[in-house]
């Protein structure tokens, strides 16, 4: 029988010897619902889903939430960056990243009655939930606002 693992932000030493928190980042590699235009998808995520979601995320300790919309216009820019090492273009429509300290907080948010009532069903309005993928990992930050930094600050 498998056992569940609880993961929280951990302290790790920085180059200066200070202890700093490590944060988790849930990345959702999203596809839009079949038949939906890129702009309708972006509009729903930015103007419908985000306003419904952001206060709930704050309530449960989310430190940062971003959406990166990968539309035809920006996909075309990739041709300027291709080289032998960077030549495979991702076809996802959006990358949504949620940063938090404690996975239990995120799990509690998903159990919130408001989340279940308003957000679970909303995903079916714009997302291809069968094709979209997810991953989670530790955040390592090196540059913020044009400045070198020693790790992510929540």
Swiss-Prot record:
Transmembrane segments: none annotated. Pathway: Pigment biosynthesis. Keywords: Lyase. It comes from the Eukaryota. Induction: Expression is positively regulated by the transcriptional regulator wor1. Expression is down-regulated during biotrophic growth within tomato leaves. It catalyses: atrochrysone carboxylate + H(+) = atrochrysone + CO2. It is an enzyme of class 4 (lyase). Its EC number is 4.1.1.-. GO terms for molecular function: lyase activity; oxidoreductase activity. Disulfide bonds: none annotated. InterPro entries: Dimeric_a/b-barrel, EthD_dom. Decarboxylase involved in the biosynthesis of the bianthraquinone cladofulvin, a conidial pigment not required for virulence but that plays a role in fitness and resistance to environmental stresses including UV light and low-temperature stress. The pathway begins with the synthesis of atrochrysone thioester by the polyketide synthase (PKS) claG. The atrochrysone carboxyl ACP thioesterase claF then breaks the thioester bond and releases the atrochrysone carboxylic acid from claG. Contrary to the other identified cladofulvin biosynthesis genes, claH is not locatilzed in the cladofulvin cluster, but is co-regulated with the cluster genes. Belongs to the tpcK family. This is Decarboxylase claH. The gene is claH.
């Amino acid at each position: 029988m498998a056992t569940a693992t609880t993961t929280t932000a951990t302290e790790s030493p920085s180059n200066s010897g200070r202890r700093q928190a490590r944060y988790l980042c849930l990345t959702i590699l999203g596809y839009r619902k079949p038949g939906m235009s890129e702009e309708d998808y972006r509009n729903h995520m930015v103007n419908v889903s985000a306003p419904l979601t952001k206060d709930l995320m704050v309530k449960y300790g989310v430190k940062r939430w971003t959406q990166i919309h990968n539309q035809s216009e920006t996909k075309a820019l990739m041709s300027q960056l291709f080289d032998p090492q960077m030549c495979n273009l991702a076809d996802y429509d959006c990358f949504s990243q949620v940063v938090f300290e404690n996975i239990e907080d995120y799990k509690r948010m998903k159990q919130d009655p408001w989340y279940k009532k308003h957000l679970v069903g909303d995903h079916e309005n714009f997302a291809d939930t069968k094709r979209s993928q997810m991953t989670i990992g530790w955040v390592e930050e090196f540059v913020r606002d044009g400045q070198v930094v020693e790790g992510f600050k929540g």
